[in-house]
Amino acid sequence: MNLKKFPRHALTFGPTPIHPLKRLSAHLGGEVELYAKREDCNSGLAFGGNKTRKLEYLIPEALEGGYDTLVSIGGIQSNQTRQVAAVAAHLGLKCVLVQENWVNYSDAVYDRVGNIEMSRIMGADVRLDSAGFDIGIRKSWEEAMADVRKAGGKPFPIPAGCSEHPRGGLGFVGFAEEVRQQEAELGFKFDYIVTCSVTGSTQAGMVVGFAADGRADRVIGIDASAKPEQTFAQIVRIAKGTAELVELGRDITDKDVVLDRRFGGPEYGLPNEGTLESIRLCARLEGMLTDPVYEGKSMHGMIEKVRLGEFPAGSKVLYAHLGGVPALNAYSFLFRNG
């Protein structure tokens, strides 16, 4: 496997820390050891997150190609768009963000706080669009790029989750290599890695990265899209392409991709009671915050899998905390009583 042949523009602090979730593990019976790898604090650029790791492999193309405007898309409370806005500000580039109405949630301040507030503060041209949630290339995003061209600019396209970009999975191939180095220092290997999945490139990169040591199917994706068939197909497709790019040496198949479909409801961006319970439990036992859209759902999935005995006793499970906490402010009504 060869990741080093791809240029990388450093946007993160370096390897993200791994630490034990001792109190949560004990609360769940103590037979499974839970750990977290903190992608949520991986950068000084507006709180960072998993997209910042991905952008390290996209930005070299933007800089080398003389692009002057980063154009990205997400929901109103998109973490991706906030991270793109931060990178643009850091590099002295312009930024246009399309924020679609992906979540069926009404709150008086939903489009004024959290991620979107930070993007505006960082100077991004934020454009609200009424289109609902879906996975793939969006018309509104293509129109935004056309607008930049008409104004004489040179737009660099960054799709939702970085996932439709050919190099969108590379960052999390690097994540797997980083984990292997940390495992050598820790003196043990993780039996399972739990991650949230929606647009697919995070899990796809992990699948390829851990396939290098035979652990592709030990990456457990927790669907948060509530459109798991689309998400699964996207993960497989991106993983196949990423495997070819990094010269993995074997094909990725459907059997390499594990996506748990039980925890994404009721729909994208809306938490269920299990999501909210898991957010509170993790926060109160570990002081580690998760959000209602992504990490609350993957945390719920991990907790339930422990409770149901789906991880064998003695397993060491690594929870990939991908970020997302800035969106909590947009859901303040749900937590008005804690």
UniProtKB/Swiss-Prot annotation:
Coiled coil: none annotated. The modification N6-(pyridoxal phosphate)lysine is found at K51. It comes from the Bacteria. InterPro entries: ACCD_DCysDesulf (IPR027278), ACP_carboxylate_deaminase (IPR005965), ACP_carboxylate_deaminase_bac (IPR020601), TrpB-like_PALP (IPR001926), TrpB-like_PALP_sf (IPR036052). The active site is at S78 (nucleophile). Pfam families: PALP. GO terms for molecular function: 1-aminocyclopropane-1-carboxylate deaminase activity; D-cysteine desulfhydrase activity; pyridoxal phosphate binding. Its cofactor is pyridoxal 5'-phosphate. Its EC number is 3.5.99.7. One of its GO terms (biological process) is amine catabolic process. Keywords: Hydrolase, Pyridoxal phosphate. It catalyses: 1-aminocyclopropane-1-carboxylate + H2O = 2-oxobutanoate + NH4(+). Catalyzes a cyclopropane ring-opening reaction, the irreversible conversion of 1-aminocyclopropane-1-carboxylate (ACC) to ammonia and alpha-ketobutyrate. Allows growth on ACC as a nitrogen source. Homotrimer. Belongs to the ACC deaminase/D-cysteine desulfhydrase family. This is 1-aminocyclopropane-1-carboxylate deaminase. It comes from Variovorax paradoxus (strain S110). The lineage of its organism: Bacteria, Pseudomonadati, Pseudomonadota, Betaproteobacteria, Burkholderiales. The gene is acdS.
